[in-house]
């Protein structure tokens, strides 16, 4: 114990000296914020497991495997990872597993942000219900924290967020809105709305939350709005590669799942079959390679709704019948799962509340 304490003290001195030297440099290769992020990462690593973190004996790795298998056995084949709150998706994935990078991708209006928000809320609610000291961290690069919280309240109160923003709700709905808001005040969900955040800054903030509050999962909306390494001059594809590698590194370092949203290329719209493929991921090489799970959100009803035939025709009657069949459904196409099967999960999507839920017949 004394030897370990002396080692920690020596490492602290070393980190302090390196930080001081970096701060004294007159060249501007690193900003003050970069120096803070680097130092905090070193301190976090030292506080967690010291410099031997990357070197693990097989016996220790095997103990972790036994612990994982024991938890799975006790759950009778149920959820071992962080629950998504969607039964069929959890059955397919077994929950969202620590150290995994999970990609949710889709074209605009498919509902990828809605799905990520639903999962974040469900995971945070699970933490709250179990009394665990932990949290969910949501990096919202596209929407403000107010817009994101409005969505969540809309989902739970079952009031259209569009009507909430316009003030077009009844007194009863407003009372329900306030009551729902009151019930969510203790939800262990943190929102970071920093635009164009760098992977280094994201890692720093995640470590801080994990140290202070505990952290079960990170959600990032979305990859293409992030920044890679400062002053990157190798092109956008290389920058996306740095970002996905960084997200995977954060997942491994903090031993949590990282859920990251991604755009798809426009070539999806140019095909007769609009179901996305792995090759449709924008700057796809590194996203596909670095991820553990890739799932696409696809709604046939969205495309069908844009092809409405002339009313009072046989074609319109057939179109309406098809819309009644699929208009409220969404498919989650799991096209990559490193440690499990691929496949499709069908969910219901309540567009007015931006809410996904299990189908009645599943």
Language model features: what each stretch is:
Residues 1-75, 79, 110, 133-134, ...:
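Short, small/acidic-rich helices and loops at N termini and domain boundaries
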Residues 86-95:
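Pre-Walker A adenine-sensing motif
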Residues 91, 122-214, 228, 345:
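Cytosolic-facing regulatory segments adjacent to core modules
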Residues 102-103, 137:
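Short hydrophobic/aromatic beta-strand immediately N-terminal to the Walker A/P-loop
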Residues 106:
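The Walker A (P-loop) glycine that initiates the GxxxxGKT/S ATP-binding motif of P-loop NTPases
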Residues 113-121:
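Motif I (Walker A/P-loop) of helicase-class P-loop NTPases
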Residues 137, 215-260:
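Helical hairpin unit composed of two closely spaced alpha helices linked by a short loop
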Residues 172, 202-215, 234, 245-254, ...:
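C-terminal regions of RecA-like/P-loop NTPase motor modules
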């Amino acid at each position: 114990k004394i030897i370990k304490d002396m080692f920690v003290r020596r490492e602290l001195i070393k980190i302090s000296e390196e930080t001081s030297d970096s701060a004294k440099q007159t060249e501007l290769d690193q900003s003050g914020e970069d120096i803070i992020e680097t130092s905090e990462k070193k301190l976090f690593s030292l506080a967690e497991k010291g410099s031997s973190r990357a070197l693990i004996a097989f016996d220790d790795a095997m103990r972790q495997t036994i612990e994982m298998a024991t938890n799975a056995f006790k759950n009778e084949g149920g959820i071992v990872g962080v629950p998504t709150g969607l039964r069929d998706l959890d059955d397919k994935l077994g929950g969202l597993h620590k150290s995994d990078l999970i990609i949710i991708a889709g074209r605009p209006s498919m509902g990828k942000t809605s799905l990520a928000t639903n999962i974040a809320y469900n995971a945070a609610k699970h933490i709250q219900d179990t009394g665990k000291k932990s949290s969910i961290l949501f990096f919202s690069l596209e929407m403000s924290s107010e817009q994101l919280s409005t969505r969540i309240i809309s989902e739970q109160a079952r009031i259209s967020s569009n009507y909430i923003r316009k003030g077009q709700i009844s007194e009863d709905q407003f009372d329900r809105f306030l009551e729902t808001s009151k019930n969510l005040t203790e939800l262990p969900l943190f929102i970071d709305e920093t635009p164009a955040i760098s992977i280094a800054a994201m890692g720093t903030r995640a470590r801080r939350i994990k140290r202070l509050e505990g952290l079960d999962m990170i959600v990032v909306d979305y990859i293409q709005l992030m920044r890679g390494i400062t002053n990157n001059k190798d092109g956008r594809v290389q920058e996306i590669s740095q970002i996905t590698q960084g997200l995977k590194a954060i997942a491994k370092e903090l031993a949590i799942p990282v859920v990251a949203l991604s755009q798809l290329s426009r070539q999806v719209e140019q095909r007769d079959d609009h179901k996305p493929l792995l090759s449709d991921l924008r700057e796809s090489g590194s996203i596909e390679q670095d991820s553990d799970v890739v799932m696409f959100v696809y709604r046939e009803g969205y495309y069908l709704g844009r092809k409405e035939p002339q009313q009072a025709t046989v074609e319109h009657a057939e179109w309406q019948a098809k819309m009644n069949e699929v208009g409220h459904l969404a498919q989650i196409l799991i096209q990559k799962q490193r440690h499990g099967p691929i496949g499709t999960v069908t969910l219901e999507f309540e567009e007015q509340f931006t809410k996904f839920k299990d189908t009645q017949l599943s």
